Amino acid sequence: MPLFHHTQKIMEKVLSVSLLFVTSFVFSQTQIKFDRFTLDNGLKVILHEDHTTPNVVISVLYHVGSKNEKPERTGFAHFFEHLMFEGSENIARGEYDKYVSRAGGALNAYTSQDRTYYYEFLPSNYLELGLWLESERMKHARVDSKGIETQRAVVKEERKQRMDNQPYGTLMEQVFVRLFNKHPYRWMPIGSMEHLDAASDEDYQQFYKDFYLPDNAVLTIAGDINSNTAKLLVEKYFATIPKSTKTIYRPNIVEESLNGPIRDTVYDRVQLPALIIGHRAPAQGSSDYYAVEMLNTLLSNGNSSRIYRSLVDEKQLAIQAGSFQFPLEDPGLGISFGIANMGVNLLDIEKAILEQIEKVQNELISDLELKKLQNQIENQFVNNLSSVEGIAENLAIYETHFGDASLINTEINRYLAVSKEDIQRVARKYFDEKNRLVLFWLPKAN
């Protein structure tokens, strides 16, 4: 073996071991300690003490997303994300936000296909305020005609601004509806404006009664707290809220094989065409999910990733390119894409993306690439847990979707257990032509 290659091999091994050791050491220092208990009404509570700063996060994750909706009443979960700031029996309309801002805090919420998440970030001496606000939301939120009409207008404007009037704004909507035929993942969380208009006040009130329940929620408190004091306050504000009286609806729908490839075209108000390749993907938490995540990191995490380097830097076919999967509770989907450079044929972008996928299908990645992937994943974990906001959200997600909040400290091991052979296997299984959607996104004629 020539000296250069021999030295290069040694340096690769030293570098990869060093990178893995450094990130493993850092991650080992970020083990999250927490207490967990459940109230008699089924509310799960997680407490994490962190006295680094005098702040606290109070969050509630409701296990309801767009997949819990009826096909003729889509958009309800996201609509309630807005409606739940209208107030309650004890909070005047429009005052919810003001309680938090006057305390020097901030608040926010989001809705996905699988969950709705609310949180307040407050100075720690306002812990009781945050708990009272969230208990009001859970116990007797204001669901009336005036609030419903107000939020209908807000949601319609949101759809216009974020989707209808944005280049490629309906891309996810167009991909999901083609990859799912039966499962409620086929519609996006924002749903149908026609469904929201057609719904009665009673429809909205029933949705609240069906899903905004203590036994359908996880309450997380993270930050500068005393756990014993926090427990007493949780019991004070939440223990008397009634639990559900019937089974909470969870869809149990298995899609048939896609029998692709599916090829289709969308015309949109865009200047540059785009090529989107979609595929069905494994459910979050399954063994294949972690291997597909590693594969997507290989293909598109950063400017040195395979798809970006090939399409953007080397061939200059695209101005942007990448690959990712949606972390969904049921089997979901993943997307690879390229936004074309001026004058580039989308067929050339399709060919270039598939070349990178086929390379993984046919050749094992190198040891150095695997170590680099592990390093990137560990860095992501460290970053996600670098704030009390991230800790609170992740504890709630692990408890809700996995039934085990302690995965906040151990899920990384599932990624590190992925082998080169696993990455090749899932590339062949999920990126197969029969499991593929190819979507041509073209400029609409004036």
Which residues are covered by each model-predicted region?
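N-terminal secretory signal peptides that target proteins for export/translocation
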Residues: 1-11
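Sec-dependent signal peptide recognition
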Residues: 12-20
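Short N-terminal segments immediately surrounding and downstream of signal-peptide cleavage
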Residues: 30-49
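Histidine-acidic residue clusters that define the catalytic metal-binding segment
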Residues: 30-36, 176-217, 227, 249-254, ...
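M16 family metallopeptidases and their MPP-like homologs
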Residues: 48, 53-66, 75-79, 93-138, ...
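Active-site SXXK
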Residues: 74-88
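An aromatic/glycine/proline-enriched structural segment found at the starts
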Residues: 181, 189, 214, 218-276, ...
